[in-house]
Amino acid sequence: MFGKILTTSLLIAMTFAAPSTEEGKSSKRRQYIAPLAGAAQVPRNPLFFAAPALPVAAAPALVRPAFAPVPVAAAPAFAPVPVAAPMVRPMLQQPAIVAPVAPVVAPVGQCPGGPSLPIECDPKRPWPQCPPQSYCYATNSVDIGPYFCCPIWSTYGAAWRPATPFYNYVPPVPANWPDVARMTANWPAAAVAMPLKARKQQKNEGDDEETEDEQKIGSAIDGWVERQAKL
């Protein structure tokens, strides 16, 4: 029993006394660790690779002479008397009155169904002045003009000048009517009952008398009719 304990203690002592081979191998082994993406490679010894320190120049010191004269401002010959400036009152300026500028309005004619487009045109060459879906129309006079481009919807589907007057046309009151008649007349209903003055046929005095030639022609025609009746 005592021998076993002695043997065990010797083995333990030899184990601690023997040099460790794993430590020697681990000291010689160098493990490489990959740096992270974007990380700077820092050297092992930063002091060895550091840039040499540059000498810093000292700031120049201002040195004055020991017995430098102190500058003294010379006193003026006479002191100016302060004069109070007159107080200027602010003048109220009235804003300038700007006349309103009238907008430039293009000339517009009158189409059968409403106002025309502000585009003048030539009836012989309506294109390209008049845009599509429009036609050239004389708004004042058929021969003189002026001619403006009228949209086709302004004539309710008819792209030509109607021959009959418009249904909403109202003739003016006669100029020779007195003021009382104008006020009492139910215009334009009164214009419907106004009879139109018929033009009398002019007759001359010599129209009833027949000439000799007409009498000869009439007698010849009558004789021919009688002869044809006897056959």
Curated annotation (Swiss-Prot):
Name assigned to this protein: Uncharacterized protein T25E4.1
Record InterPro entries: DUF5346 (IPR035231)
Stretches for region Disordered: 197-231
Lineage: Eukaryota, Metazoa, Ecdysozoa, Nematoda, Chromadorea
Keywords: Signal
Source superkingdom: Eukaryota
Signal peptide location: 1-17
Database matches in Pfam families: DUF5346
